[in-house]
């Protein structure tokens, strides 16, 4: 289990100067050719998403203005707050900030031939499904994960096991992404 606080994470500026990324985790850890990766991006200007052949990307708008996503003949989609949207990461996708204001989003990318991610928003106590990897990010409220208290802009990632997240207040929201491995693949094969 690895814990993080978005406010304390290192920031990598994009080459096109349109935004920045905070990498949460990758699997396998510290590998350039990852099977899955979670990150948070701040987008300050219109531009294109980086291409990642053979990957699927799920983007969830966390805050800021809505974002219009356009991919030639594939789709036109308005990204709304806390509504995950999946697309092939090898498609050219243009992002336009519809309100002209900076947006922040959660990204999870998975290698299509190895694993699949699901992203959802939780508003009550739950236990993970025993997936072989996952990430949680607190949008608001106070949550307990094991003996650790997580509050706004904090989270955790893990590479296996079942975990219970307890909401400690009457209300709270948390982004949860689980990783499931496709038949014939296992994280045990790469560690």
Swiss-Prot record:
The protein's name: Protein Ves
Organism: Escherichia coli O139:H28 (strain E24377A / ETEC)
Family recorded in the similarity comment: Belongs to the Ves family.
Any Pfam family matching the protein: HutD
């Amino acid at each position: 289990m690895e814990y993080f606080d978005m406010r304390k994470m290192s920031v990598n500026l994009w080459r096109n100067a349109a935004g920045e990324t905070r990498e949460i985790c990758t699997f396998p850890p510290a590998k350039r050719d990852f099977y899955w990766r979670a990150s948070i991006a701040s987008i300050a200007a219109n531009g294109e998403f980086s291409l990642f052949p053979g990957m699927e990307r799920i983007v969830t708008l966390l805050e800021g203005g809505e974002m219009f996503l356009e991919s030639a003949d594939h789709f036109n989609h308005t990204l709304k707050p806390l509504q995950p949207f999946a697309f092939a990461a090898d498609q050219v996708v243009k992002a336009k900030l519809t309100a002209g204001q900076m947006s922040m989003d959660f990204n999870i990318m998975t290698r299509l031939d190895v694993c699949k991610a699901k992203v959802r928003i939780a508003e009550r106590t739950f236990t993970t499904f025993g997936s072989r990897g996952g990430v949680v990010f607190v949008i608001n409220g106070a949550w307990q994960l094991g003996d650790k208290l997580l509050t706004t802009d904090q989270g955790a990632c893990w590479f296996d096991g079942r975990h219970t997240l307890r909401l400690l207040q009457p209300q709270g929201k948390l982004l949860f992404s689980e990783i499931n491995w496709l038949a014939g693949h296992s994280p045990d094969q790469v560690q």
